[in-house]
Amino acid sequence: MAAFVAAALAQIGDRTAWLAAILSDRYAKPGLVIAMAALALFAASGLAAALGAVIGPKLAPNAQQLMLALALLLQGGGSFFPAKAPERLDRWKIGAIATTALGLFILAFGDGVQFIVLTLAARTPVPALAAIGATIGSLVVIVPAALMGEAAWLRLPLKPLRIAIGTVFLIFGIVLALGALRLV
């Protein structure tokens, strides 16, 4: 559940949803974009969760909590900066399926959600649930973006939403960090 909520909040105003909207407009196939987004997001989250499963047992519980706090603080801090427009992938000539799947995978693998997935997977006995939750949570935002298209997506009040969500991430990150350091 934590991965679902964190991913859904983090994707609002993020570049992955924006790229999904761009590709949906280009190919006029929102269903294809959504399917490839699900595949790409699950692959990226699965890799992050697998790494978390390897790292988690090597860390003390406080270290796991501190790592999650850091992930939330980084995601929250990044939310205060405007999202840079994603590469439109205009020069990619590998077809709609491959362009969408690879483009979204590359973008998703580098975003803050994956660090959150890694840290959540490190703390749980079933790391795959972090990947599944993050994938579904991300799709909660990416599906509407793909269905709306870029122009409608960008008309949403994304900046104030990013700031509000960033504030929430920062608050939770600070509380978790203070708890991990035994300061509260």
Q: Which role does the model predict for each range below?
A:
Residues 174-184:
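Juxtamembrane boundary at the C-terminal end of a transmembrane helix
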Residues 54-65, 125-134, 156-164, 184:
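Interfacial loop-to-helix junctions that mark the boundaries of transmembrane helices
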Residues 40-44, 95-108, 163-175:
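Small-residue-rich segments of transmembrane alpha-helices in multi-pass membrane proteins
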Residues 28-87, 144-155:
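Membrane helix-loop-helix hairpins that form the core translocation module of multi-pass transporters
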Residues 1-12, 35, 80-107, 130-136:
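Small-residue-enriched transmembrane helix starts and helix-helix packing motifs
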Residues 147-170:
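Interfacial loop-to-transmembrane junctions
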Residues 1-56, 116-135:
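Juxtamembrane transmembrane-helix termini in multi-pass membrane transport proteins
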